[in-house]
Each structure stands twice: as structure tokens, then as C-alpha cells.
Amino acid sequence: MRIEGRTQFEDQQSQTVRPLRKLRRGPAEHLRDALAALAQHHATFVRHSERAWASITFTGARHSVELFFDGADAVAAGEEFVACLPDHEFTIRGQIVAEANVTSVDHTLLPAPRMEVSVEVLMLDDK
């Protein structure tokens, strides 16, 4: 079919293709990235929930995260993660990590080594 001297196919080909916009990543995604790096990328994120938090002077969110470490190497990385988390200096733009605590740890050895870790992180808006 011709439209003003061009076929319909030619008309479709001449349309400008715009690149996809990057999805905006929020503090929760940046926190998961930081936790994954601290876990040496051996952790599987099972659950992540976020609750708004506020005081008279600060606002932010409390994050609850569950991670699994499967296999001997992953469990070793998990043990290091548990030891380092409370004192770790996070660098998340626009956020201050006020608290990072391990709330539970569960080890199993059979049928394969596995470690389940629950953490809570309080992030405050840095504005």
C-alpha cells in the first residue's frame, strides 16, 4: 500500500526508535545491592519488606530482609556477612543507615549446608 509516495513498510521503518528509559531505582534496590556485595554475592534474597519509619526529626524506612546461603562456600560468606553487618559503613546516596542488625540465623548441614539469615536495617532520609 502506498501512502504519499512510500509503502506502509517504509513508513514504519522511518519512525524514530527511542531508547528505553532506565527504571528509577530507589533506596530498597540500592540496599539490596549493598547487602549482596557484603555477602560476596553468595546470598539469595528470599524476602524484603519495608515499613515507613519516622521520629520528630527524621523520616525513613525499616527494611526486613531474609537471605539464604546455600553450599559450603556460601555459608562461609554468610558467616562473614553476619560478623560484618552491624559495623558496616553503607554508602547509599540520599540515605543514612542508622542501624543494621542480624535478627536471626539458622544453620542446617544436611542434606547440604545452608544458612538462613534475617536482618533489619533502618535507613533515614538524608535531606
Enumerate the predicted regions with their spans.
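Long, contiguous binding/interaction regions
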Residues: 1-64, 68-127
